[in-house]
Amino acid sequence: MSDQSNSRLIYGFHAVLAKLRHDPEGIFEIYTDAQRNDARARDLLRHAEQLGARVIPSEGERLDKMVGTRRHQGVVARVDSRRKELKLPDVLDGLTEPALLLVLDGIQDPHNLGACLRVADAAGAHAVIAPKDKAVGLNATAVKVASGAADTVPYITVTNLARALREMQEAGVWVLGAAGEAERSIYTVDQKGPTAWVLGAEGDGLRRLTRETCDELVRIPMYGTVESLNVSVASGLCLFEARRQRSMA
């Protein structure tokens, strides 16, 4: 029986399969909808069996109650919540290419956090950094939306975001803050060297101290009538522009 006090729930095929592939030892048990026998369910069960994970066939209603939603796709896993506390130097010291980091300032919506993790994975970002307080944590909803990226992208939480940004600067990382009123655009600022993109919550933007700590504020050009983008969309534009520039270097 797993230690409930040291566990959290993740759900959805992408999230559970990613956990099986990257950290099978961190899985206590997997609950599956006993009525599902399609190819995706069989594939997950095969992976679980190969890795020796404990599988508990369950009623769909039980899964609904466990996670508080019916959008679990018939698979829920109880995993070890005692993740190794990664520090920024742990990531930076092991890099063989210029750093590409995503920093989230005060994101409150778990859907946005999950989407940002997914974008960071797709763009090959080396870590996502966020404050421990006044921001959403890595809960089951964020993990599901991340579609497995929560177990592939290092997620680092810090007690003082401004201090963390200064640590990045001391390590040679150029810290760029996304701000709509900035003069330079993401297409004119050089991102070929070690770069950290800092994005704030949709609507509120970057906090004052965060803005003041950034090396430079940069805007995403807007050509239509809307004034802002969802933070995950903005993250994708910034990170992939960095990748585009680096591919041309």
Predicted regions and their residues:
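Structured adenosyl-cofactor binding patch, chiefly the S-adenosyl-L-methionine
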Residues: 17, 121-122, 143-149, 208-249
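A short acidic, often aromatic-flanked loop/helix-cap motif at beta-alpha or helix-coil junctions
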Residues: 61-66, 83-85, 161-165, 184, ...
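Short, acidic/turn-prone active-site loops that include or flank metal/cofactor-
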Residues: 35-36, 61, 133-135, 202-204, ...
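Active-site/ligand-binding-proximal alpha/beta "capping" segment
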Residues: 176-232
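N-terminal positively charged helical leader segments and presequences
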Residues: 1-91
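RNA substrate-binding interface of SAM-dependent RNA methyltransferases
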Residues: 18, 22-25, 32, 36, ...
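Short basic, glycine-rich beta-strand/loop surfaces that mediate nucleic-acid
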Residues: 66-80, 146-149, 154-158, 191-200
